[in-house]
Amino acid sequence: MEKVPGDMEIERRERNEELSEAERKAVQATWARLYANCEDVGVAILVRFFVNFPSAKQYFSQFKHMEDPLEMERSPQLRKHACRVMGALNTVVENLHDPDKVSSVLALVGKAHALKHKVEPMYFKILSGVILDVIAEEFANDFPVETQKAWTKLRGLIYSHVTAAYKEVGWVQQVPNTTTLPATLPSSGP
């Protein structure tokens, strides 16, 4: 964190770099194996996200009351949202060669979550950390450092595009409510 005038802390933003050809191939190879089980992987990601960061459930009237991970796994609404999340990620991963398409897709996601759903953008960073954790576990024996770095770079790129969309629509950060903020952030990198 770095200080800016007014004693506000902001995250230092890394340059929004595109992935290299080798990084794109590493991400796409990993993703192809994950996406083969799209719904189950998506559900596992969302269940972990909501169990570890229950404040995120506040945006989902259909399952915000659920505490039991098994109940969440069985929820048709959660499963449907998991498929939407995985579908959006799939579009991004399939189009890593086309920065304009990636930017367009993530702008739509960001604007919808800012304007329609009123989701705090920090949840994108948290969710992407959970995604990286699940990928690392799925490929524990086959997730080399280069691939981890490529996914971490993609995570930063996604967050950068989504938060740019929030800024574009004039998002004003909501006043923090200690009952809705996550206690900790995921352990994954930037």
Swiss-Prot record:
The nitric oxide dioxygenase activity is activated by a reducing system composed of cytochrome b5, its upstream reductase CYB5R3 and NADH. The formation of an intramolecular disulfide bond between cysteines Cys-38 and Cys-83 specifically enhances the nitrite reductase activity. Residues 1-21 are annotated as: Disordered. Heme b binds at H81, H113. Disulfide bonds join C38-C83. One of its GO terms (molecular function) is nitric oxide dioxygenase activity, heme protein as donor. It comes from the Eukaryota. Residues 18-167 form the Globin domain. Transmembrane segments: none annotated. It is found in: Cytoplasm; Nucleus. The keyword Metal-binding applies. Induction: Up-regulated upon hypoxia. Keywords: Cytoplasm, Disulfide bond, Heme, Iron, Metal-binding, Nucleus, Oxidoreductase. It catalyses: Fe(II)-heme b-[protein] + nitric oxide + O2 = Fe(III)-heme b-[protein] + nitrate; Fe(III)-heme b-[protein] + nitric oxide + H2O = Fe(II)-heme b-[protein] + nitrite + 2 H(+); 2 superoxide + 2 H(+) = H2O2 + O2; H2O2 + AH2 = A + 2 H2O. It is an enzyme of class 1 (oxidoreductase). Monomeric. Homodimer; disulfide-linked in vitro. Also homooligomeric in vitro. Belongs to the globin family. This is Cytoglobin. The gene is Cygb.
